[in-house]
Amino acid sequence: MKFLGENPFYTLLLLTEKPGKWPPWSLVPLPLALAALAGLAWASAAGPAWGWATAGLLLVVALADWALLSSLPRSGASFGPAQPPFLALSALRGLLAVAAALLARWGAALPWALHGTVQLALLFLAAYGTLVEPFLLQVTRLEIASPRLANPGGPLRIVQLSDLHVERLTRRDRALPGTVAGLDADVMVLTGDYLNTTYNQDPQALADLAELLAGLESPEQRYAIWGSPEVDRTDLLRPILEAAGITLLEDRGVELHTDRYHLWIMGVTCSHDRAGDAERLRRLVAEAPPGALTLLLYHTPDLAPEAAALGVDLYLAGHTHGGQWRLPGFGAIVTSSRYGKRYEAGHYREGNSHLYVSRGLGMEGFGMPRARLFCRPELVVVDLAGRAGADPAPRSQNGPEA
């Protein structure tokens, strides 16, 4: 898979895949070795009693980590392998314990108490990130006014679903059709990545996705695009989307014209070749009916400069998951966008264009932890209202050079 190998984030994902296939017993030496190493460091710095206490604490939290991670598939919370996140947590815990031992030379009690608190906090965050936050669905509402819309009957409401990453249906997925129906939207759009990469040919995952999409019976106008080519197997997903009555926009546009709105929805298939994808976007913008508000559906936010230069009114994307793990005051730790944190999540203005990057609903695959931290799953509702004023600016037929 060329793209996966070229993107550092996905290179990391590939590296996590192999440990997910290791037998659980093969993991035992690492926490034992780290507990012994940290125990020796504390014994050397503060005495044998502190060393035994540290080694015992690390073994206890390692057992708790494994109990938590291995229980996730049985509880129906998520369905990824436990081995890679367990190894990562064990390594982090060992590093913290050894680092804390360096402070123990000036007095052991306070550093050990702080170290123990951090170790327990990691367990709490792991439980919260895997069992709680992935199910705290947030409905984000955005209001945009445009002189291209009259809206005598009220705003045009669009609901966006992105990055479902289905492995097996969870309680979040089962609640989704009812949540969408309650939003009373005019148009629903899906912006790619329907199955998790490691499940994208799995018969049960495909059947579960079909059940989920079939349940999304409203609104009547439903459109979808493809996500990353390595994730979305179009040959397997096309029949599922079509059976659910969802219209695929594969490098084409569709015009919706009523007495309430005049909309040109463009779907660009994501190849992660920015120059080629931008050229197909230019063609679709050139085909836009005069006076129509243009809505671009593209899986990643990476065409934002081109879309703004071409005068696209609204651009809905996903792909980044908002980072999936965020730090307060900093935001996404890492994103899979070529622009890094520039378009990590949320609403952006580029000239007269609006971009919204959804945090998505699902989580990364391979051996990555099926966890969200300070980055709740998101359903996006955009209300497009008319605005009196100057005539809208004409659209350019040429974006920036790729």
Placement of each model-derived feature along the sequence:
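Non-catalytic terminal accessory segments
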Residues: 1-137, 390-402
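N-terminal signal-anchor transmembrane helix
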Residues: 107-118, 122-183
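Soluble catalytic domains of enzymes that build or remodel membrane lipids, polysaccharides, and related
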Residues: 150-396, 401
